[in-house]
Amino acid sequence: MPSTDTIAAVATAVAPGQGGIAVIRLSGPAAEATGRSVVHCPGRQEWGSHRVVYGHVIDSEGRRLDEVLLLLMRGPRSFTGEDVVEIHCHGGVIAVQRVLEKVLRQPGVRRAQPGEFSQRAVLNGRLDLTRAEAVSELVAARSRRAAELAMAGLDGGIQAEITVLRERLLDQLTELEARVDFEEDLPPLDGEALLQQLQAVRLELQQLVRDGERGDALRQGLRVALVGRPNVGKSSLLNRLSRRERAIVTDLPGTTRDLLESEIVLEGVPITLLDTAGIRSTDDAVEQLGIARSEQALATADVVLLVLDGHAGWTAEDAALLARIPAQIPRILVANKADLPAGAFPQPVDVQLSALEGMGEADLVQALLERCGAAGTDGMLVALNQRQRDLAARAAEALARSQEVAAQQLPWDFWTIDLREAIRALGEITGEELTEAVLDRVFSRFCIGK
């Protein structure tokens, strides 16, 4: 599906004073002509596909804007399947902006929309939709495990899984439709065996959905709030988990007067630890502001660690804090100071540890991952994203309805209705059955330049 216009955008992250090199990407019929117009190459350098040339970008008054390398990739041997030019210029906001503005002033060139390069790759058959989504997920990966799963998708893991399941359903649909049209000429169809095969596909789809939900923790990370009355060791626990002195640790109540954050990775899961100010009654205006932010962190956390003083035991303040945790948010009761004699608790705690000595830390990590559904991701080969999970769940529901049709002993043509729906949903995962409007919605979530 050749495009009539040429798009351009910065394909690398740009920040003030950061990054030695930036890449400006062009794709479309005017890409090569634009590259030749914008980049002036000294000497007799040979232009060719997949060759690099050296030159300068010059403004309308003949002044050099930047020293660059240009890489031409003629279609269809390119990411988008179209003629693609990459201009490698110096990094930094100003240098990149000047070169991009020069590119966008050329005839037939416009600024790319978010995800438009990947969308063209899909429309031109260079990528299936799951691989295109994996590119975006690889760029956004916040941990090595998330990057590994994204690479599995980029290598075709998701596409292969879904294609196999879809082909199994297509085989069954072929059998059913043959019986509808030529039942008298064919041997009887074993409906029970057919149902077993549909049930097997449904169970595999449901497992993919469950794995994908765990994969979300790897992609998006978790927000974990450390809550407790003052001086129970929340800041010590934050420092223990993050392996650095992120919070000031003293024996004075109210030392943490604001919300502190620390980014860590536990068992491949990116986690934002929120060390909240001790929630208590106070006349200190600054501390009151920190407490208000702590309460907001409670409402937005994926899981709450209620840190208790294991030496002092359970108090009325602990009970009040437990009651303030929203009911729908998982919570873990952590008795800190396990290196000291234990106090009394009216209910069992989930984890006993010493933030100072490190004992019990592994138990806390395991409890945290299990409570938020992020445990057991090591054996996962692929992880469906939200869009893919919704479609896989829709296919599984359609297959469940086919069992209801069988129970009612309806004719074969009734079976085909839900089977076609399941096949269509799986085709939407890989992009085999998608409208351009749906593609626009999918790629609008991508970064510009991807």
Curated annotation (Swiss-Prot):
This protein's source sits in the domain of life called Bacteria
Keyword tags: Cytoplasm, GTP-binding, Hydrolase, Magnesium, Metal-binding, Nucleotide-binding, Potassium, tRNA processing
Q: Which GO terms describe its molecular function?
A: GTP binding; GTPase activity; metal ion binding
Q: Provide the binding site for GTP.
A: 231-236, 250-256, 275-278, 336-339
A GO biological-process term: tRNA wobble uridine modification
Chain sites annotated for binding K(+): 231, 250, 252, 255
Record-listed Mg(2+) binding positions: 235, 256
For this protein, the Enzyme Commission number is 3.6.-.-
| Cofactor annotation | K(+)
Subcellular compartments: Cytoplasm
Ranges of residues in domain TrmE-type G? 221-373
Which Pfam families is this protein grouped with? MMR_HSR1, MnmE_helical, TrmE_N
Amino acids binding (6S)-5-formyl-5,6,7,8-tetrahydrofolate: 25, 86, 126, 450
- Describe how the cofactor binds: Binds 1 potassium ion per subunit.
Query: What's in the GO CC field?
Result: cytosol
Q: Which InterPro entries match?
A: G_TrmE, GTP-bd, GTP-bd_TrmE_N, GTPase_MnmE, MnmE_dom2, MnmE_helical, P-loop_NTPase, Small_GTP-bd
By sequence similarity, the record places it as follows: Belongs to the TRAFAC class TrmE-Era-EngA-EngB-Septin-like GTPase superfamily. TrmE GTPase family.
Question: NCBIfam families attached here?
Answer: mnmE_trmE_thdF, PRK05291.1-3, small_GTP
Self-association state and partner proteins as the record states: Homodimer. Heterotetramer of two MnmE and two MnmG subunits.
Summary of the function given for this chain in its UniProt record: Exhibits a very high intrinsic GTPase hydrolysis rate. Involved in the addition of a carboxymethylaminomethyl (cmnm) group at the wobble position (U34) of certain tRNAs, forming tRNA-cmnm(5)s(2)U34.
Q: What is this protein called?
A: tRNA modification GTPase MnmE
Q: Which organism is it from?
A: Synechococcus sp. (strain CC9605)
